[in-house]
């Protein structure tokens, strides 16, 4: 009797192993039939069946068929843990409050988003633009009267007047040159920066921080061409050398032998009255005209002199 029971049990296990693949497919079909044949009121009342997992890969002997009232055969797993069944029942009982809470949270988020956008809760689609610049917000009105930054004003002016962009393109200059600061002059930089004239000075930008821009050769060439067109600074001193006549060298073809001798300075009365400091000046003899005889006691210069002993001797000998 026991051997017959064991043989029949082994045969049933072999049959189940052979038909394992067909049973998994039939289980899914049976579950779908049960769902489609159930009424909507039953689905709304109990949703625990939604949380039951479908195990298509099951070992043989782990499934059995259950026939319910007014329903087809539904295959359920006999190896399911009781804990999973309890969790499914608990989740099925609490699924409806969770769905309501989720719906309320979604409504609150929609209300908060619509309030922040300044529109009503009914009008969910928002106006994102006129089609040309969709997604680009217009400039907010300057209600507080605060001064705007120069870059914003220039960008706004460039957007309002597209002719300036055409002027830049006509001149062959990129748009960055119009907004960039001119390069400082080397001489002005030495005077202003205490000798640091080669250091570039650029204005601070609040929107661009920590970005090192490497200029291209074309951009540098355009900037140099623009700086050349600037008017010269009238306050800068000219660096032309002053020619001194005394230090001027003669031309190479000049002959030194033909140079005129330096002129003597005119003599003054001090040279005669101060013989110590000035050289002696030769004075011509004043001879009387022929036929006249000067007085022996009167010299040629007109001043009377006393006779010396030699003069007396010559007179006596004569």
Curated annotation (Swiss-Prot):
The keyword Protease does not apply. The keyword Phosphoprotein applies. Signal peptide: none annotated. Keywords: Phosphoprotein. The modification Phosphoserine is found at residues 249, 257, 260. Residues 7-20, 99-110, 150-168, 175-193 have a biased composition (Basic and acidic residues). Residues 1-23, 54-318 are annotated as: Disordered. The P/V/C gene has two overlapping open reading frames. One encodes the P/V/W proteins and the other the C/Y proteins. This is Protein W. It comes from Sendai virus (strain Ohita).
